[in-house]
Amino acid sequence: MNILLLTSEFAPAAGGIGTYAREIAAAAVRLGADVTVAAPDYADDGVARADRAAPFRTHRFRGGLHSIRDLPGKVRLARALTAADGHDVVHAVDWPFFLPVALARARTDARLLMTVHGTEINEMQTAGKRLAVRLAGTFGPRAEVVANSEFTRELFLSRFELPADRVRAIPLGVSEFWFGPRADRDAVRRKHALAPDALVMVTVARLTQRKGHLATLAALQQLAEPLRARITWLIIGPDGEAGHVAQLRAAALAAGGDIRFLGRLPDEEIRDIFGAADLFCLTGVPDPSGRVEGFGLVYLEAGACDLPSLGCNIGGVAEAVAAGRSGLLVAPTPEAIAGAIAKLAEDETLRTALGRGALAHARALSWDRCAAATYGLAPTDDILLPPVDREQVALAPFAAGDVAPAAAGSRGEE
């Protein structure tokens, strides 16, 4: 099978879209496909060296972070690449390539796939974008839409009138990297000056309002002092909105306790910290701007390191955290979060059981399985998705004409 992927985000830029493109392409190669990835070069001469080490071909086009000015160039690129080779599948990995691939459909007999990740569905509800989608026939009869979760699928179907059988939910996978060797737990705790009896809670996410750091902080302040004094909270991830970051840092300072902002860290160090921690906590909250948590890959990455998760039951998080098996899911309120933190902190047996469940859940969701289901490279009958609460779709209403921020990535980058 000959597969062409087109993505507006890729290495060296960090983000969830780039991770998706890289991992599904590599998995498709492992399953026997011939894969080419078209990705921006970010004006970085060093990308060619890294590309040579990849198991797939990489076609770099001139560009960086997507803007509307790039659309004509992406249309020309999609037309040229789809006409050049006998592709069996042309895959628009993210929304900036939806319209270009749709406009190139006359040049190829290939299957046309488009992956939706969550937030961009709401972003496409402005009058201008809906008109462009309709005029281009973006989701016409040949388009197959792949959603990263059942939540995202339901959200898409609530916004666009497509037959339900043309929109599939295929869960993401976990890179083998996260199952790899970690530094000794005690050594990592000594390196970070973590008390031997401390309960270490770690969060990995960009410091943005919707990731719920303030909700977690408010929850910690509700805990009884003896328990609160035991908890060390390690916050990993780059800064997001400047105003929010300043508010969060000031609130953490005023709250007291052992709260540490570690900033952006390499994956190897994050993996080591996961191995030294007791609990992964990411308590996202509804965002009125229309941004949603389409899946939540970072919960699975923590799970690959035997770490149980605490999350809020919003968006697609319920499909990344198996409630009661790999972690706990609660309402996005400080009171509910505080109760769950206390429950996990005081019950080591529960944490151990959920950690084992988190590892099993992460193992069950591989990138090979994701690629097989997406491209039809292998049987996929064993891919099961948890049921979705359709009322969750209504948590983040988005009216046509509203403007949401541009989509970004995951795992500390979103």
Put a short name on every predicted segment:
Residues 146, 195-211, 217-221, 234:
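Conserved donor-binding/catalytic core segment of Leloir-type glycosyltransferases
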Residues 323-324, 328-335, 343-349:
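Conserved acidic donor-binding segment of nucleotide-sugar-dependent glycosyltransferases
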Residues 336, 343, 350-364, 376:
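A short, well-ordered alpha-helix in the C-terminal region of glycosyltransferases
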